[in-house]
Amino acid sequence: MSDTSTAPAEPARARADLSSTAPAGHHWQEIDALRERHRYFWNEEAQGYWVLTRYEDIREAFQTPEVFSNHSIVATNPDPAYRFLPSFTDPPIHMKYRQPMNAWFSPGSVRKLEPRLRELARAEVEAIAGEGRADYMATFADRFPVSGFLASMGLPMDDADLFVSIAHRMSGASGGEPDAVERMTAAWGELAAYWTDMLADRRAHPLDPSVDFLTMMSDAKLGDEPMPDIDVVDIMVTLTLGSLDTLKSQLGWQMWHLGRNGDDRARLVAEPHLIPSAVEEFLRAYPIVSMARKVTRDVDFHGCPMKKDDMVLVSNQSACRDPRVFERAADVIIDRSPNRHIAFGASEHRCLGSHLARAELRLAIEEWLRLIPDFEVAADEPLLAKGGQISLLELPLVWPTVARS
């Protein structure tokens, strides 16, 4: 792990604000510039933390959980008062938490769900196609992740509005609002209370565990013992967040690109078989999330003198755009191959729902282009995006409509 021959005598220090609101695209430009200046650096934001910027170093950190622990995954919060399960666990317990869920989120299970997901995506596009304009973030990107999540869990659509409301409040923590953290904390509590009540109901009135995720989890084992209710609730909160807010953000960026790049949009209309490849490229070129790790012991990481309990931002956002790995890394090439991006992480903690997310991202493009093949971004001024989890605040789109007889 030590490689001091090319390391500077003293690691660089900087103050990089990666959480503020800025014009769309600015966050990646800043990350790209930092990566080319520093292989790693100490960021003086909050309590201070290391930032790894290069693809190979980041993969190594993901693959070394005995040094880079998941006990905290937010760089500015080394000792969180809440738990994301199974995200906040390391091997070997991590796989014990994931094991009951693996089959549910497997490629085969997602394929069986795809016809229902397509229906839901089509319904959301049909609801706005005749309007000729929409804020994509407040319409499709708001609703489809919720309906897709409820469908994937085997839940009815009755509570869709509740989940949309909670998702709004939980997504505001890095958007700059004065009360954002308080609103997010309150929404977290509301979501935990919801799943606590739902779990109690499933224990009293179980449904078919082959189609109802919560019934399946109510019987889940942690090794040889029943999984505690508090752990099941924490898992449900984590799955909710991962299914709603992150998917909404990624949906926004792929449509932002297609609304600004008519040649790519026309090519996907003419060659829809390229849409899966385009989704992978949008994930690579517009990576929205970076993970953090907590150092378990003093270590020299390729010349970087990390101390026990230091926080490290393991920047997927930087790795996915590293020109040492990706030719023309700053360009979007919708048929790029190979494409070894790590937008979903790497190693054991790779995103559990990645197959579901890929299907939803693909179906969103397929169904939109089927009804609205010609559209563009309407904003005259640069759009704004919040940092942290990089997400557009709005995305106004316009398109020609066909008069109905």
Where are these regions (language model features)?
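Cytochrome P450
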Residues: 1-405
